[in-house]
Each structure stands twice: as structure tokens, then as C-alpha cells.
Curated annotation (Swiss-Prot):
Pfam families the UniProt entry points to: Ribosomal_S28e
Keywords, ordered alphabetically: Ribonucleoprotein, Ribosomal protein
Highest rank taxon of the organism: Eukaryota
Protein name as catalogued: Small ribosomal subunit protein eS28
Gene transcribed to yield this protein: rps28
Gene3D superfamilies: Nucleic acid-binding proteins
Keyword Ribonucleoprotein: yes
GO MF: structural constituent of ribosome
Alphabetized InterPro entries for the sequence: NA-bd_OB-fold, Ribosomal_eS28, Ribosomal_eS28_CS
Keyword Ribonucleoprotein found: yes
Organism per entry: Dictyostelium discoideum
Gene Ontology CC: cytosolic small ribosomal subunit
A biological process from GO: ribosomal small subunit assembly
Length: 72
């Protein structure tokens, strides 16, 4: 295990489940809000999640800069 290459993990709470996507509906598009930010600076992202997910679930995000494209 390489301890020199540590990755920062951000916790995010699912605020809204938008739709199912993917060729077989295996991916769910959700809106998440980052935890641990200041009250006036809530930051939300649109993410694709593989597997079961519900509103108010907590996700561990390794990459927090990229946002998923909105699907119809």
C-alpha cells in the first residue's frame, strides 16, 4: 500500500434522485450537496451513481471537480 499517494475523500449527501440512465438503467443521476462546507456556501453537483441510491444517502467522492451532463 502506497501511503505517499493519499487521496482526499469528500463526503456528499444525496439531495435529489433525478433519473435512471445508461443502456440498461444501471446508473442513477443524482444531485449531491457537499458536507462540511460553510452554511452560506452550499455547493451542489450533478453526479452519476452506479448501484442503489436513495435521497439522504451519503456518498464518498474521490473526484469532486467534474459534473455529469444533464440527460433527458
Amino acid at each position: 500500500m502506497n501511503t505517499a499517494a493519499t487521496e482526499t475523500v469528500q463526503l456528499a449527501k444525496v439531495t435529489e434522485v433525478l433519473c435512471r440512465t445508461g443502456s440498461r438503467g444501471a446508473v442513477t443521476q443524482v444531485r449531491v450537496e457537499f458536507l462540511g462546507t460553510a452554511q452560506g456556501k452550499e455547493r451542489t453537483l450533478l453526479r452519476n451513481v452506479k448501484g442503489p441510491v436513495r435521497k439522504d444517502d451519503i456518498l464518498c467522492l474521490l473526484e469532486t471537480e467534474r459534473e455529469a451532463r444533464r440527460l433527458r
